[in-house]
Amino acid sequence: MKKTIGILGGMGPLATCDLFHKVVEVTEAGTDQEHIRVCVDSNTEIPDRTAAILSGGADPVPEMVRSALRLECMGADVLIMPCNTAHYFYDQVTRFVRT
């Protein structure tokens, strides 16, 4: 059984689209059914990560966790984030998810 990818996106909506496009492009599939199942949560409600890091802006972790949990509920077996700055919060987010 194939795994389902969950894209925790919206932190740069174009980065989310770009990553999804790359997943499709590199997948060796001859038919639609041979592609990898991908769930996307393009959550534009996630506060600015740079502002949180540099100037004490709103904490993005709660909204990132909500997105991760939504993706898990959608069947994601693995989560990926197409945002470099979001990885600053990786350890905090992964405490709340099983994926």
Which residues does each predicted region cover?
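Non-catalytic structural scaffold of enzyme domains
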Residues: 1-99
